[in-house]
Structures are given as structure tokens and as C-alpha cells.
């Protein structure tokens, strides 16, 4: 009988010998490869934390002790050890979340997936324990790039100030972007001490620093300069101990016995302590180890034996953007690219291969990325910062006060905009158009197809006196949606076929095919509709108000929150223009959406063609009892421009 099937909770681990624990670790890796290959998910990070998670649950008593995972995609093993072994519907409707979930288990403290936050959570929980005189332990697991985020270092600065507050910080150093990216290293480390045992750490520590991405070699050289006249090296605990934090390590993150010993020492310490664990991302799975780019950080459905993806049909939005960026880079030397530790996921890997000196990976530091982009623009370049829509939320102040206030020509490309589905509440890009509506001067484009991604990206980078945003969906991009004409700066996708149309249907971004379907359904009900794509949804096109005035009702359809979104902006523009036409906005309701497929989520919130057509039909029926049709004709439609 496999050992894994006997684990129903953390305390079941207590009965296993070290030999059995090693066997369990291998069973877990086999399980993860088999399960995640069928559903997709974060495979590489979890293969790297198997022994570490086992040791954590043997040393600490969850849920009494709080074990928190930063970038919660590292929590699959934690789920398995806390009684959740049905991965058949991972990230699917009714199945396990891809991140910690309070609804799933009392062992999940926070539902986090945005990086670098766990130390702040842990600081607050530890303070609460101290005030309420509880003897519970708080353990924060951070790594897999999360220490490149400034928020983590803000928390460390506060944590280090309380020497008597118990808090265990486990640093999962998997060689993949573990790099505390901070400035002024020479000054910060000026008081580095040398230890009596530094000779034992010389070779190992130098290797640790030199293999640390981004800052490793410069850090070593800085230390060498800062300690000129003394020894040329310092043991790796220096950067943490100089902050006032006790340090244990480095520990082999795949040696359960060594891990348990180190964690037990940290548990007894009585103050904040760092346990530094060296792990291997993708451990035990050869295809992941051979993937130098990201060690199978996140995968779709794959063949478990080879790791090759199960083919998907058609191009995706991200690759269309990435290919156009290469073309722009070849045409314009001032085009540079920025990513926040997401080079491949946002499609900038091809640009980086062609222009390695014109791409900047700043780590998980969206705030810094936005301000650095402002500096690049002020210096005469045009930066394109590609980021998931949900992660731009973290840099709003910088977009507002550094980029927009200074009228910097920066282009933000928002990938995974709208409903993303399987990654759940934290990854839906459903707030960007609402948040960005308030930014003065900012221009926002929502392309409807691949051709428009290319065209509107080019339009965006031609703007040098204001921030521009291009946002698009996740996954495969559908067929081209041709325009039949243009009114102002808006593409007309369908003409009404009558001089007195009922509905002006405003389609935003990738929802163009849905809006054309809605128009077809309305037509069957005897309701005529004009379908337009504004292309640039901020600012509202000047032609919108006179066009709306020639219809009986305006309907907006957007893959964004209804609160403060495109519909709200158009309603305000109509009011400002004195146009008194009813407007009905359809979008995402103001609530967090659970994980499921995109189609299932859209159906759940009523954002489908049949649902919208039914409601619009009802609205027009009500108007028929109260108003007469206007007789004004629509202006002639100009031919579509290429």
C-alpha cells in the first residue's frame, strides 16, 4: 500500500521512519507529475519543496501553528499532506484551487498568490500571538523569486526590530531568481563580520553568491570592495544577520533529517530566525531539469514521460505580442522591454534573444519596474512594460504619480486581462480598466483580435507624451474580426440595416465575437443593432455621444468590473454631452470569482451572448411602452482604414 494513501493529516507523518519519509517524497513526486500533467499547474516549484514541506509538518503542529506559503503555488505538497489528495480537478470548477484556500482546509491560513506578501502576514500574526499571549508558532515560507520583491524587505526590516517575537522564516533558495534586489549594497553591508569558521564556507558561499541571478556576481564584487584589506568573502548569513535576524543554514533542502534539525532549532530560538534551504526546482523530473528557462514553473497539459505540451490549436495573444515586439525592436532602437520576473510568460523571451541588452528583468518588483520605465522614457527611450493585468494593481501609485504626472511615454502591456478562469480570484485581470480610468492623460486600448494587437501596439509606442496601455486576454486568439467601416476612431463591426436602429452595442476587446452573436440574436427578435469597437476605450471617442444619440439604448459589454469600467466611462461621457439615452452595462460583478474554466465563469456571471440578448430584449420591450422611435438617421459610415 503506497505511503501517500495513508496520509490523512500532518500527524500521520510522525509514525514514519526516515527511510519511509524518503519513500514518501518519491511517491509525492510521482503523484505530482502524473496529476499535474493532466490538468496543468505549477509543477516545478512543488517538485522542489517536497522534503521541505514534509519536514515543516513534522516539526510544526498545523493548524495550531500557522504555516504560510508565499507565492502560494508552492502549496501542492502541503495540500497532499493535509488530506487533499484528489487532484483530478485541480484548478477546475469544484476541484482544488491552485493556491492555498481557506474554503478547502483549516491548514490554509491565507489565499495568496501575489508574491512577496507572506512576511507581512507573518509579522502581523506573530504580533497577534504576542499580544494575546499565545504560544503558537508562525512559519513563513518564501522563495522562488519572492525575495526580489521590495515588500518582503520592508517586512524583514520590521520583523528584525522585535528580537523577542518568535517567527520562523524559511527561505526556499532554488537558484531561480532568489536575489534580494536592493540598492546601496556596499553601504548596507559595510559592517559585515567575518566568522571564525569562514574558511569552511568560502567555496560554498562564493558559489552561492555567484550563482544568484541578477545580483550574485555584482554582490560578491561589492563585498570584496567593501571589505578591502580584510578577507574577500563573507558567509552567506551576513546579509540576514546584519538586519538583526538569526540565521540557520544553508541546509540541504532535500535532506529531511537535516531540515528537521534546523527547523527544530529555529522553533526553539524565541525570536525571528531565517532558515536558509537549498532546493532544486523541478527535482526528480528530468524534463523539468532540462528546461533551463524556468524549470517547468507552470505548465499546461503535458505528456508526463516527455514533458512535451499537448498541442493547442492556433496562436495565442501573448505570442502575437511577442512577435510584434521583435519587429518593433528591429525598426526602432529606442524600444526597450521590461518584465517583472515574467520574461517567458509575457512573451518577451524572443525579444530578449534578439536584443539582450534592451530587455530588463527587474524581479518581482512591479513598482520599481514602473518607475524605472519612467526614467527610461525621460532618458529618451520608449519602454514597454509587459505584465499580467492583475499584477499592475501593485504599481498603481507609480503609474499615477511617476509615469502619468510626468507625462512619460511608457507603454504598459497587460496580459491575462479579464476573466482568466482556472487560476482563480487573484489572477483574474478584472480591475485594470476601472483602476486606470482615473489616471489623467492615460490612453487605453483593448484589441479585439491579433491584427488589432499588432496595430494598437504600434499606435501605443508612437505616443511619447503620455502613458499608454494595451490589454488582451489569456490563451488562444480567435479569427480576425473585420471592420465594415469606421466612425471617428471607432471600428464599426456591424451596421444596423435600418435608419432607426434600436441598440448601440459597444464591444470591448476580445468580446467582439460575442457582441456580434448578441446582435444576431437581437435581430431574430426584430431588434436592430449597431456593433462598434471603440479600439481605444480611454478616452471615450468624441464620436460616441452623437452615435449613441441616434439609438434608443446603449449597451456596453466588457471583460472587466462593471464598477468604474468602460460602461461607466461611456455613461459619464454621454451625460457630459447632454445625451439622454438609456445605457445598460454588462461586465464582471464586484466580487471575487472562484477558479473554473473561462467559459464556466462567464456563464456563472451571465456574461454570455444568450444571457445578454435576453436582458437587452427585455429592456427594449420596456422602452416600446414608453418611447417612440427617434427618426434621426445615422451618419454615413466611412470605409474601414487599414
UniProtKB/Swiss-Prot annotation:
Binds 1 Mg(2+) ion per subunit. GO terms for biological process: 1-deoxy-D-xylulose 5-phosphate biosynthetic process; isopentenyl diphosphate biosynthetic process, methylerythritol 4-phosphate pathway; terpenoid biosynthetic process; thiamine biosynthetic process. Pathway: Metabolic intermediate biosynthesis; 1-deoxy-D-xylulose 5-phosphate biosynthesis; 1-deoxy-D-xylulose 5-phosphate from D-glyceraldehyde 3-phosphate and pyruvate: step 1/1. One of its GO terms (cellular component) is cytosol. PROSITE patterns: TRANSKETOLASE_1, TRANSKETOLASE_2. Thiamine diphosphate binds at residues 73, 113-115, 145-146, 174, 285, 366. Its EC number is 2.2.1.7. The lineage of its organism: Bacteria, Bacillati, Actinomycetota, Actinomycetes, Kitasatosporales. Homodimer. Keywords: Isoprene biosynthesis, Magnesium, Metal-binding, Thiamine biosynthesis, Thiamine pyrophosphate, Transferase. GO terms for molecular function: 1-deoxy-D-xylulose-5-phosphate synthase activity; magnesium ion binding; thiamine pyrophosphate binding. The keyword Magnesium applies. Its cofactor is Mg(2+); thiamine diphosphate. HAMAP family: DXP_synth. The keyword Transcription regulation does not apply. This is 1-deoxy-D-xylulose-5-phosphate synthase 2. Catalyzes the acyloin condensation reaction between C atoms 2 and 3 of pyruvate and glyceraldehyde 3-phosphate to yield 1-deoxy-D-xylulose-5-phosphate (DXP). It comes from the Bacteria. It catalyses: D-glyceraldehyde 3-phosphate + pyruvate + H(+) = 1-deoxy-D-xylulose 5-phosphate + CO2. InterPro entries: Dxylulose-5-P_synthase, THDP-binding, Transketo_C/PFOR_II, Transketolase-like_Pyr-bd, Transketolase_BS, Transketolase_C, Transketolase_CS.
Amino acid at each position: 500500500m503506497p505511503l501517500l494513501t495513508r496520509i490523512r493529516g500532518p500527524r500521520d507523518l510522525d509514525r514514519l521512519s526516515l527511510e519511509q519519509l524518503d519513500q514518501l517524497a518519491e511517491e509525492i513526486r510521482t503523484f505530482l507529475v502524473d496529476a499535474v500533467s493532466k490538468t496543468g499547474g505549477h509543477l516545478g516549484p512543488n517538485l522542489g519543496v517536497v522534503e521541505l514541506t514534509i519536514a515543516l509538518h513534522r516539526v510544526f503542529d498545523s493548524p495550531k501553528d500557522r504555516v504560510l506559503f508565499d507565492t502560494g503555488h508552492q502549496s501542492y505538497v502541503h495540500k497532499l499532506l493535509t488530506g487533499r489528495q484528489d487532484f483530478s480537478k485541480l484548478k477546475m470548477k469544484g476541484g482544488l484551487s491552485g493556491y492555498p484556500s481557506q474554503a478547502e482546509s483549516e491548514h490554509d491560513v491565507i489565499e495568496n498568490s501575489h508574491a512577496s506578501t507572506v512576511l507581512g502576514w507573518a509579522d502581523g500574526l506573530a504580533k497577534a500571538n504576542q499580544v494575546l499571549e499565545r504560544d503558537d508558532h508562525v512559519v513563513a515560507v518564501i522563495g522562488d523569486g519572492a525575495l526580489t520583491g521590495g515588500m518582503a524587505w520592508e517586512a524583514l526590516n520590521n520583523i528584525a526590530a522585535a528580537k523577542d517575537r518568535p517567527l520562523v522564516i524559511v527561505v526556499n533558495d532554488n537558484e531561480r531568481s532568489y536575489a534580494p534586489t536592493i540598492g546601496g549594497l556596499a553601504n548596507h553591508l559595510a559592517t559585515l563580520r567575518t566568522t571564525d569558521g569562514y574558511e569552511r564556507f568560502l567555496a560554498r558561499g562564493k558559489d552561492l553568491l555567484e550563482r544568484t541571478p541578477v545580483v550574485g556576481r555584482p554582490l560578491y564584487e561589492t563585498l570584496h570592495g567593501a571589505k578591502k584589506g580584510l578577507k574577500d568573502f563573507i558567509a552567506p548569513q551576513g546579509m540576514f544577520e546584519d538586519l538583526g535576524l538569526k540565521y540557520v543554514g544553508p541546509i540541504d533542502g532535500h535532506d529531511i533529517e537535516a531540515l528537521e534539525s534546523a527547523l527544530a532549532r529555529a522553533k526553539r530560538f524565541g525570536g525571528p530566525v531565517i532558515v536558509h534551504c537549498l532546493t532544486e526546482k523541478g527535482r526528480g523530473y528530468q524534463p523539468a531539469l532540462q528546461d533551463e528557462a524556468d524549470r517547468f514553473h507552470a505548465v499546461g497539459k503535458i505528456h508526463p514521460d516527455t514533458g512535451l505540451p499537448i498541442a493547442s490549436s492556433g496562436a495565442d495573444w501573448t505570442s502575437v505580442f511577442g512577435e510584434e515586439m521583435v519587429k518593433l525592436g528591429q525598426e526602432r532602437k529606442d524600444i526597450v522591454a521590461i518584465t517583472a520576473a515574467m520574461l517567458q510568460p509575457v512573451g518577451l523571451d524572443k525579444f530578449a534573444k534578439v536584443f539582450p541588452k534592451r530587455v530588463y528583468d527587474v524581479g518581482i518588483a512591479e513598482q520599481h519596474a514602473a518607475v524605472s520605465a519612467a526614467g527610461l522614457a525621460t532618458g529618451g527611450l520608449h519602454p514597454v512594460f509587459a505584465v499580467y493585468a492583475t499584477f499592475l494593481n501593485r504599481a498603481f501609485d507609480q503609474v499615477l504619480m511617476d509615469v502619468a504626472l510626468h507625462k512619460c511615454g511608457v507603454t504598459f502591456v497587460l496580459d491575462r486581462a479579464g476573466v482568466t478562469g482556472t487560476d482563480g480570484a487573484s489572477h483574474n485581470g478584472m480591475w485594470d480598466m476601472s483602476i486606470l480610468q482615473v489616471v489623467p492623460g492615460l490612453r487605453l486600448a483593448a484589441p479585439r483580435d491579433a491584427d488589432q494587437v499588432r496595430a494598437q501596439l504600434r499606435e501605443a509606442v508612437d505616443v511619447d507624451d503620455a502613458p499608454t496601455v494595451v490589454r488582451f486576454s489569456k490563451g488562444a486568439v480567435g479569427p480576425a474580426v473585420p471592420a465594415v467601416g469606421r466612425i471617428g476612431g471607432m471600428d464599426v463591426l456591424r451596421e444596423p440595416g435600418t435608419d432607426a436602429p434600436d441598440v448601440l452595442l459597444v464591444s470591448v476587446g476580445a468580446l467582439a465575437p460575442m457582441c456580434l452573436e448578441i446582435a444576431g440574436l437581437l435581430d431574430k427578435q426584430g431588434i436592430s443593432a449597431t456593433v462598434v469597437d471603440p479600439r481605444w476605450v480611454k478616452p471615450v471617442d468624441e464620436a460616441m455621444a452623437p452615435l449613441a444619440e441616434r439609438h434608443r439604448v446603449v449597451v456596453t459589454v466588457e471583460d472587466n468590473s462593471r464598477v468604474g469600467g468602460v460602461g461607466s466611462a461611456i455613461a459619464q461621457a454621454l451625460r457630459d454631452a447632454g445625451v439622454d439615452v438609456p445605457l445598460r452595462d454588462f461586465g464582471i460583478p464586484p466580487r471575487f470569482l472562484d477558479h473554473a474554466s473561462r467559459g464556466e465563469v462567464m456563464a456563472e456571471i451571465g456574461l454570455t451572448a444568450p444571457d445578454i440578448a435576453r436582458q437587452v430584449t427585455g429592456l427594449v420591450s420596456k422602452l416600446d411602452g414608453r418611447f417612440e422611435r427617434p427618426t434621426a438617421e445615422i451618419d454615413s459610415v466611412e470605409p474601414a482604414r487599414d
